[in-house]
Amino acid sequence: MLNVLIGLHDTLQIRLEGGDGSVLFSMKGRGSSEIPNDKGNLCVQAAIRLIERTQRNDVNILIELDKRIPAGGGFGGGSSNAAAVLSAVHEALGQPLDEVELAKLALSIGADVPYFLRGASQVCVGGIGEQLHIDRSSSLRSTPVFLILGLPHLGTPVVFQEAGYSTRMENSVKKPTNSFPEEYGLLLSLIQNDLEIAASSLCGLLKETLAALRALNCGRVGMTGSGSGVFILPNDQTGFHIEDVEKLEEYCLSHALELVKSSII
């Protein structure tokens, strides 16, 4: 599996102060009213587990989150925020854990957290998220990408269950591919998402949207993560043609979806 970073992001403000090991969390922004603000939030989990692992009950961690990444879209918002909390708080505590210990802690929070903790863009991921190999090819760097937001929320465990997988996938662990082709067209031809069929069966609107966008032939259309977000890469790596952008804008406008332009970092 190839994971890449894009320009869409949330904003975190994190402070440490003397205390009793409490985690104080607040959130605003996109969809914040629908996202857990207790231990069900990966940011809170990351802070609590780091306090427990380092036995630092003499500090409180204050976290403020401004959401821009839609929840339940498969964009890794929760996992990337958890990784950011781990990294920032761990550094503020004087880096008491070594790299391996911190990576294990990250994996205990979520399968995608180690990837975001690593901080590299193009990474081939295998196992249950612990096998990471940086892909140093330039296949996708700086490539523009369109994101389709506004489709119904899909929970990762539900999609995995529909696909017949455990979310931990102990019985289907695969070694990561060490690299992907540098030729852009060949790379596009290899892009697929094994969870798309399951996610589409749970969300008819996702299935309809993917089919309609592919019929427009404006680029390579795929589903992000476990859904329900959709991405479109240009047929030509130099960028999207004006007529393709107009088609995408018209489709999203007529279907009450949000079209966001970003790029791969």
Indicate where each model-derived feature is located.
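Residue-level signal for inorganic ion chemistry
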Residues: 12-14, 43, 78, 147-148, ...
